[in-house]
Design a protein with these regions (language model features):
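Polytopic transmembrane helical bundles with strong interfacial aromatic enrichment
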Residues: 1-525
Length: 525
C-alpha cells in the first residue's frame, strides 16, 4: 500500500467532510445575528422565533464542525510530518492567531449566547452572538491565509532549504489569500441563504398542505392558524415567509459576489498557476476559446487526444486577461516550461522514498480539474437561478402547493454545498504534483516549493494510514448520522421544537416576551 496515496485520500475525505460544516457555520451565523439584531431593535416576536429556530440549527452545525475540525490539526503531524517541518515556521503565526484569538472568541462568546437568554441584557446578549460570529469569520481568514501561502508563497526567505518567515504582513495580505477569502465568504453566505430558503419553503408548503394557509381568487395568501398544533399561528407564517425571502434575496446577492470574486481569482490563477487553469479548461494548445464541453481521456497523459466539442471563441482569453484576443498558454506549452524550471525527475533524496528519481508528471488530473471547475460553476448557477425564481413565486405571500417544487427547493439546499466542495477539490487537486506551489511571478518568492511526494511522513506505513482512515471514517460516519438526525428532527419540529414555551404559554409569557428561565436549557445542548 502506497502511504502517499492513502494519506492523500484520508486528508481529502476528512477535509471535504469538515468543509461541509464550515460554510454553513459562517453563512448561517451571520444571518442569525442579523435576525437577533432585528428582534432587539423592533421587539417583534417574528424575529425572536427566527433567531431561536435558525440558531438551534446553527449550534448543531457549529458543534459538529468543531468535532470534525480537530482532526485536521493532528493529520499534519501523523501523516504529513515532512510537510509540517517545511511549512511550520510560516504556518505557526496564522494558525496560532486562529486558535488563540479567533476560536477563543467563537467558543467563549457562543457559550455566553447559549446560556445568556433572559440572564443577560438584550444588547449584551446580542453582542455575544456578534462576537462569536465575527470570531468565526476571522478564524476562516487565518485558515485561508495558511492555505493561500501554499498556493502562492510570500513573505519568506530560504534558509537551509526551508522557508523562514521574514514578513508576517506579507503573509497576511497575500493577494491570493485576500481574493480567496472574499470568494469563500461569499460562497458561505450563499450556503446559509439557500439553507433558509429550502427549509422555509418546506414549512410554508406544509401549511398549504394542512389547509392552514389558502389562496384566494386573486392568488393572494389567506393566512390561517391551527390551535391544535403548537406554533402554527399567523406569526408562524410570517417567520417562514420572511426567512424564505431573506434567503432568496441574500442568495442572489451572494452568488453575484461569488461570480465577481471568482472572476478576479481566476485571473490571478492564470498568472500564478497557469497549468492548473489550462487543465481546468482542457486547453492542450495555446488559444483564446473556452471549452464548454470536451471529450476524450482527460485523465490520460496524451493531451492531444482531448477533443473540444463546444467552444466559445475569445471567452478563455477574457477570463484570463480581460480581452478577447490574447492567447492563453495551453498544456503542451506549459509542461515543458515546468520541466525546464523544476526538473524532469524527482531528486534522488531519501525523503522521496521509493519515488526518488521518478519522472515528474506536472499535468494535474484533468478529469478532476475540468469537471470540478464546471460543477462548481454549474451548481452555483442552478442555485442562483432557483433563488431568483423563489423570489418571484413567493411575491404574493406563500409558495405553490406543489410537492415536486417543494422537494426541488429542499434538494436545492445541496447545490451551494456541491459548488463549495467542487471548488475546493479543484483548487487542491489542480496544484499537483506540488503541495507548496512555485509561482515567483508576479509577487511570489522564487525557489519556495515542495513536491507532494516529499510531504508524507516517512515513518508511517500504508497499513497504519489505512487503519487511521478506517477509524476516522467510522467516527465521521457516526457524526454524520448524529447531525442528520438532529437537523431533521428540529427542522420537522419547526419553531415549536426550538421554543417549547409556545406549547405552554401562561400569564408569565406574553406574546412578545422572550423565554423564561426554565426554558433556557431547552435551547442548549
Amino acid at each position: 500500500m502506497d502511504p502517499l496515496e492513502i494519506a492523500r485520500w484520508q486528508f481529502g475525505i476528512t477535509t471535504v467532510y469538515h468543509f461541509v460544516m464550515v460554510p454553513l457555520t459562517l453563512g448561517l451565523g451571520l444571518l442569525v445575528a442579523v435576525m437577533q439584531t432585528m428582534w432587539v431593535r423592533t421587539g417583534n416576536e417574528r424575529w425572536l422565533r427566527m433567531t431561536k429556530f435558525w440558531g438551534k440549527l446553527y449550534l448543531i452545525n457549529f458543534i459538529m464542525g468543531v468535532a470534525t475540525g480537530l482532526v485536521q490539526e493532528f493529520q499534519f503531524g501523523m501523516a504529513w510530518s515532512e510537510y509540517s517541518r517545511f511549512v511550520g515556521d510560516v504556518f505557526g503565526a496564522p494558525l496560532a492567531m486562529e486558535g488563540l484569538l479567533a476560536f477563543f472568541f467563537e467558543s467563549t462568546f457562543l457559550g455566553l449566547w447559549i446560556f445568556g437568554w433572559d440572564r443577560l441584557p438584550k444588547k449584551v446578549h446580542l453582542a455575544t452572538l456578534w462576537t462569536a460570529v465575527v470570531g468565526s469569520v476571522v478564524s476562516a481568514f487565518f485558515i485561508i491565509v495558511a492555505n493561500s501561502w501554499m498556493q502562492h508563497p510570500v513573505g519568506v526567505e530560504l534558509v537551509d532549504g526551508r522557508p523562514v518567515m521574514n514578513d508576517v504582513w506579507a503573509v497576511l495580505t497575500n493577494n491570493t489569500a485576500l481574493v480567496a477569502y472574499s470568494h469563500t465568504l461569499a460562497g458561505a453566505v450563499a450556503v446559509g441563504a439557500a439553507f433558509l430558503l429550502g427549509i422555509s419553503w418546506y414549512h410554508l408548503w406544509q401549511r398549504r398542505r394542512d389547509g392552514i394557509d389558502t389562496v384566494d381568487d386573486r392568488g393572494a395568501v389567506v393566512v390561517g392558524e391551527r390551535a391544535d398544533i403548537p406554533g402554527r399561528d399567523r406569526t408562524d407564517h410570517r417567520v417562514w415567509l420572511t426567512s424564505l425571502r431573506i434567503g432568496a434575496a441574500v442568495a442572489v446577492a451572494a452568488f453575484a459576489g461569488v461570480a465577481a470574486t471568482g472572476d478576479v481569482q481566476g485571473k490571478l490563477m492564470f498568472e500564478q498557476q497557469p497549468l492548473k487553469m489550462a487543465a481546468a479548461e482542457a486547453a492542450c494548445h495555446d488559444g483564446t476559446g473556452f471549452s464548454v464541453l470536451s471529450v476524450g481521456p482527460l485523465g490520460g497523459q496524451d493531451c492531444d487526444e482531448v477533443v473540444t466539442v463546444i467552444e466559445i471563441p475569445g471567452l478563455l482569453s477574457f477570463l484570463a486577461h480581460n480581452d478577447f484576443d490574447t492567447e492563453v498558454k495551453g498544456v503542451n506549452t506549459l509542461v515543458p516550461e515546468y520541466r525546464e524550471a523544476y526538473g524532469t525527475h524527482l531528486p534522488d533524496d531519501p525523503i522521496y522514498g521509493e519515488r526518488a528519481g521518478q519522472e515528474i508528471d506536472y499535468l494535474p488530473l484533468m478529469e478532476v480539474t475540468y469537471w470540478g471547475f464546471r460543477l462548481m460553476i454549474g451548481f452555483g448557477m442552478l442555485a442562483a437561478a432557483f433563488a431568483a425564481l423563489a423570489l418571484w413565486l413567493t411575491r404574493k405571500g406563500t409558495v405553490p402547493d406543489s410537492r415536486p417544487l417543494m422537494w426541488t427547493a429542499v434538494a436545492g439546499i445541496l447545490a451551494p454545498f456541491g459548488a463549495n466542495i467542487a471548488g475546493w477539490v479543484f483548487t487542491e487537486m489542480g496544484r499537483q504534483p506540488f503541495v507548496v506551489v512555485p509561482n515567483p511571478n508576479p509577487s511570489g518568492v522564487d525557489g519556495v516549493y515542495m513536491f507532494t511526494a516529499a510531504a508524507v511522513s516517512p515513518g508511517v506505513s500504508g497499513q497504519e494510514i489505512v487503519f487511521s482512515l478506517a477509524t476516522l471514517g467510522l467516527i465521521y460516519g457516526v457524526l454524520l448520522v448524529v447531525e442528520t438526525v438532529l437537523i431533521v428532527r428540529y427542522v420537522r419540529g419547526g419553531v415549536a421544537a426550538a421554543m417549547p414555551e409556545l406549547a405552554h404559554r401562561d400569564e408569565e409569557h406574553g406574546p412578545t416576551d422572550g423565554p423564561g428561565r426554565d426554558d433556557v436549557l431547552a435551547f442548549a445542548y
